Curated annotation (Swiss-Prot):
UniProt cross-references to InterPro entries, sorted A to Z: P-loop_NTPase, PanK, PRK/URK
Entry's localization field: Cytoplasm
Any one GO molecular-function label of the UniProt entry: pantothenate kinase activity
Protein name per the record: Pantothenate kinase
Main location: cytoplasm
Chain ranges passing through the membrane: none
UniProt keyword annotation of Secreted present: no
Top EC class of this enzyme: transferase
Amino acid sequence: MATIEACDFFPYTVLSRSQWKSLRKASSLPINEQELEQLVGLNEPITLNEVADIYVPLAELLHVHATAYQRLQQQKRGFFHHGKNRSPFIIGLAGSVAVGKSTTARLLQKLLKAWPEHHHVDLVTTDGFLYPNETLEARGLMDKKGFPESYDLPALIRFLSDVKAGEPYVKAPVYSHLTYNIVEGDYQVVHEPDIVIVEGINVLQVNKRNHHIPNVFVSDFFDFSIYVDAKEEQILQWYIERFKLLQNTAFQDPNSYFHRFRHLSEVEAEQFATSIWKNINGVNLHENILPTKHRADLVLQKGPHHFIDEVKLRNI
């Protein structure tokens, strides 16, 4: 039996890895080893067994929610006697830098596409709604990149509002991790999806400084939300490992914003990454990201090697 744990006034059903694994219904995997390699991050050794044990049951749970949502929307259209555009099921996915949000989002997108009821699944990251570096520099916010004030929240909320309203073509700005900046004139077009996954560190934050659109928050548009969690010391280690791997890959590109760090020694690289964590990412985690964890419908608790140790499902 699952145990019940009260987490900051939010009761969760806490399932161990074995309990969660036992919920899986599917007998086959809609993904192979080669496809998995293309989806996982640099230092995330996720296996097909991990996909089968953790991510397939999660996709099955999301399928239950998404199809129930679709039926409700259909019944509402019938009740009001109009052919209103279909409103997609929106999943919010939050968590710290380097915790593995992007891999989780890509895996869920791949798995959810396997159902004919919702084969069109779009993935949008909130990185595209960061202000351009030029704007951040002018406002003295480059060291606050990733903090709530570094995002164009009104634009993100307008985007989500249009998507949720069923607008047929909605554009999202594109962010380049190579240049560490918004790609001017480039957009991702969201066209009548069944499901949209919105991934970003900030998606569950309630930013009370947003005076342009009062009392409206990014999470208001979510039908289900997920928080990917791990101990901070583990996340820091993953962050350092990723930085070192990028030194030998992306940082070698002359167009990379971090090209100047490619020749740091191993000790220097670890010291630099640790400093960035302590002064920026760790501060953001404690001030803005971690406090939102218990607003999520489901928490994936990671242990070593990005393997999930337990799953917490909110009851209210």
